[in-house]
């Protein structure tokens, strides 16, 4: 689950980190009033969406004119912002963040992720702030400095100082940076973050450290113990199909291909997508129905897959370990009848009662293609998607 910038900065403020005074506004009038409340003669207005690249897409504006703030809010509120990180539809803008303007002398980067290779939270800092950290990692990886947090000892001030030295901070800035580092590390653990970015973390004209931006991703598996964070969820930013799938405990991710995939098990699902690609097809989705697949869940899975008009064929790949293949076959038949599937369906069954499952499919009156192997399934579904 992701947070909006204004939500991230509210958390920063709770932990005593330096952020700009700002207000998230629902209307153009609120945005104008927020600028008046903040005071000063320059403000920054930002569209609030779960995507980067807002500035290049026109979703960020620096202005000294309140009427320009009104015009900006009237233009964007209720519309979709399309950036390089969104699909062609973009994401809806329901709030505008109005902030005081900060004079920038230098831009830095500070972020943290859960690194699965080290099984630790890893902080990353760089002098290359304001640009995509992925670009820095690819082109100049030596400019990214890391601090690995030991879960037994927790974050240590010396780690912040080490990063600060590498960033070229002076003694005053070093103290401020250490406070930011320690606060972020505590926040990361307290709220079960999966990702944290401040890009840019700036040095102001006065020489102070300031959190100019904020990006937070939460570990969805931990939301049960994070009620405050869970209440910050903005469903309007979610893919409608992914949100619908979550209600039925289906793991679904929309892609841009034409072969729908329904699989039980995340690893098998990824392998299925790979082999579809290998045989010249393009998966339209990742969909894991889980180990406890039922007729109802299979039916919902079909509905979700077929809600994508790009899908020209569906591959169902089931390994019967926890579930019986004959039961899954009956579920597939029931789902196809209920949903009214009009595209070719290729089914590959292996494992418990696989032969019985294939027999159930063969005895149905439906035009379901039974595959003899995973390779055969991939070849059949790619041909079907191409209309062959």
From Swiss-Prot:
The entry's keywords: ATP-binding, Ligase, Magnesium, Metal-binding, Nucleotide-binding, Tricarboxylic acid cycle
GO biological process: succinyl-CoA metabolic process; tricarboxylic acid cycle
Record-listed substrate binding positions: 264, 321-323
Pfam entry (one): Ligase_CoA
Ranges for domain ATP-grasp: 9-244
Cofactor section: Mg(2+)
Cited function: Succinyl-CoA synthetase functions in the citric acid cycle (TCA), coupling the hydrolysis of succinyl-CoA to the synthesis of either ATP or GTP and thus represents the only step of substrate-level phosphorylation in the TCA. The beta subunit provides nucleotide specificity of the enzyme and binds the substrate succinate, while the binding sites for coenzyme A and phosphate are found in the alpha subunit.
Name under which the protein is recorded: Succinate--CoA ligase [ADP-forming] subunit beta
Native source organism of the sequence: Shewanella pealeana (strain ATCC 700345 / ANG-SQ1)
Source taxonomy: Bacteria, Pseudomonadati, Pseudomonadota, Gammaproteobacteria, Alteromonadales
């Amino acid at each position: 689950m992701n947070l909006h910038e204004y939500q991230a900065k509210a958390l920063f403020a709770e932990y005593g980190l330096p952020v700009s005074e700002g207000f998230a506004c629902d209307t153009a009038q609120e945005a104008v009033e927020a600028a008046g409340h903040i005071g000063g003669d320059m403000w920054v207005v930002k569209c609030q969406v779960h995507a980067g690249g807002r500035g290049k897409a026109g979703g960020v504006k620096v202005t000294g004119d309140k009427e320009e703030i009104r015009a900006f809010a009237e233009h964007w509120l209720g519309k979709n912002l399309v950036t390089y990180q969104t699909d062609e539809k973009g994401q809806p803008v329901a709030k505008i963040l109005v902030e005081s303007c900060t004079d920038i002398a230098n831009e830095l980067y500070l972020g943290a992720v859960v690194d699965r290779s080290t099984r630790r939270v890893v902080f990353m800092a760089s002098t290359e702030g304001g640009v995509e950290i992925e670009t820095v990692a690819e082109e100049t990886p030596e400019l990214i400095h890391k601090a690995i947090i030991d879960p037994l000892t927790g974050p240590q001030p010396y780690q912040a100082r080490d990063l600060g030295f590498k960033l070229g901070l002076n003694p005053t800035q070093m103290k401020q940076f250490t406070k930011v580092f320690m606060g972020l590390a505590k926040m990361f653990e307290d709220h079960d973050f999966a990702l944290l970015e401040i890009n840019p973390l700036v040095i102001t004209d006065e020489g102070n450290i300031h959190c100019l931006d904020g990006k937070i991703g939460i570990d969805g598996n931990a939301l049960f113990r994070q009620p405050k964070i869970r209440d910050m969820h903005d469903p309007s930013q979610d893919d409608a199909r992914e949100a619908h799938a979550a209600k039925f405990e289906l793991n679904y991710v929309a892609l841009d291909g034409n072969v729908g995939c329904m699989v039980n098990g995340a690893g098998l699902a990824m392998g299925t997508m790979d082999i579809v690609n290998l045989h010249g097809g393009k998966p339209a989705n990742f969909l894991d129905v889980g180990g406890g697949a039922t007729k109802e869940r299979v039916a919902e899975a079909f509905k979700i897959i077929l809600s994508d008009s790009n899908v020209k064929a569906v591959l169902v790949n089931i390994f019967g370990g926890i579930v019986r293949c004959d039961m899954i076959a009956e579920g597939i038949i029931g789902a196809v009848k209920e949903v009214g599937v009009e595209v070719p369906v290729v089914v590959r069954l292996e494992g418990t009662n696989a032969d019985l499952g294939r027999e159930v499919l063969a005895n149905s009156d439906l035009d379901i293609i039974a595959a003899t192997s995973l390779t055969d399934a991939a070849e059949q579904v790619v041909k079907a998607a191409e209309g062959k």
